[in-house]
Amino acid sequence: AIKSDYPKIKFKVGDRYYWSPSLQTVFYAPLNNGSIDNVLLIHELSHAILNHSSYKKDVDLLKIERQAWDKTLELASAYNVHVNTTEANDALDSYRDWLHNRSVCPTCSAIGLEVDNKEYSCVACGTKWRPNEARICQLKRYKIK
């Protein structure tokens, strides 16, 4: 029913759940028993419905994730899918942790500010750095000279 309700959005099997705005496709990864995690599918569909495509500042990612989880709760109700709000909050917490970790100065460990598109500056020691994407890999921070 979900797929037929959104004919302009493609759904394809992938190695994880994510929305690809360039392909207009929701990718999903069936579980070992072949079933689909409907909550994650609806969450990624929510990104599609909300036209989420990119973000300029890291804090914007947290904002669009919050929007997507709010939409997930709305859609899940319409499709009679139970969303464990603790798990949804845990997912948002993981983005908050991601944001915090990116803002830690690689020189003095103080919290820096994102001053430009994915460029941080430490208010304590003046170091500037760019973190890698690190949403699904290990975080690295590269000092800017």
Question: Predicted segment positions?
Answer:
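Short N-terminal micro-motifs specific to bacterial/archaeal maturation
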Residues: 29-32, 59, 113
